[in-house]
A protein has these predicted regions:
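Left-handed beta-helix
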Residues: 1-241
Length: 241
């Protein structure tokens, strides 16, 4: 039984399903995947990954050459970009296409691998991206009481919406690592925001699927060109039959 419940369980269950070959001599090309718990699908990944990037999941996303990932990162929904991003250990990112209140916009939702997403955001034991939510806000000069008093984290409108990819890049880095960026703070304060509860209601699933199909098409072209090293061309057809 494989349970796709929490973020960590999604990776651990997929790892259990996929790692069925224990005799490394049966794998024609070793070293293609630097760690068994790295999963990339329907995505463009241009940054170098190593064995330090365990528990990494990239789906329907563009991770450019200027991205730095440190392990235990889940990245979903990120459109093509040329961003410079430093995603710390255990920090994840979901981007959701939204057309309200701005058309052709994206909501930016960074979160922690182990976030429970519950609890009053003003209480010290409510965590966000691995730290107290109140500490996260204090480091960034944000007064949570001014934004949404006594909100549960799941219902707190902290995820900014923008049509501007450069603004989204700036706000992302401010939210996950560069807490001292004053201009990014102002962008975040002025931007319309949604909560986790609202994302599923407002997501434009057609845009999300169109992006996935575009990435998949690019992946299939790359797989065909890389047939000498692709695991799909190693399939034993007798076993499959």
């Amino acid at each position: 039984f494989y349970h796709y419940g929490t973020s960590r369980e999604m990776i651990s269950s997929t790892l259990s399903i996929q790692n069925l070959v224990y005799d490394q001599r049966r794998i024609m090309h070793l070293g293609v995947k630097p760690h068994p718990s790295i999963f990339i699908q329907n995505a463009l990944c241009k940054t170098a990954l190593t064995e330090q990037n365990s528990n990494t999941w990239i789906e329907n996303s563009c991770v450019g050459e200027h991205w730095q990932l440190h392990g235990s990162n889940i990245i979903t929904g990120v459109p093509e970009n040329d961003w410079h991003v430093d995603l710390p250990l255990g920090v994840c990112l979901d981007m959701v296409p939204i057309d309200t209140p701005l058309p052709n916009a994206y909501a930016l939702r960074p979160y922690g691998m182990h976030d429970a997403f519950r609890g009053d955001i003003t209480l010290p034991d409510t965590t966000y991206m691995g730290v107290s939510m109140s500490e996260w806000a204090s480091l960034r000069g944000v007064n949570l009481e001014d934004i949404q008093p006594q909100a549960d984290l799941q219902a707190a409108r902290i995820f900014p919406i923008s049509q501007d990819m450069k603004a989204l890049e700036r706000m992302l880095n401010w939210m996950v690592s560069n807490a001292g960026d004053v201009e990014a703070r102002e962008m975040w304060l002025k931007a319309p925001k949604v909560c986790a509860n609202e994302l599923s209601d407002q997501a434009n699933l057609r845009r999300l699927q169109a992006q996935r199909e575009d990435f998949r098409s690019q992946n299939l072209t790359a797989l065909a060109a890389n047939h000498r090293r692709s695991v799909f061309y190693q399939t034993n057809l007798d076993d499959m039959a």
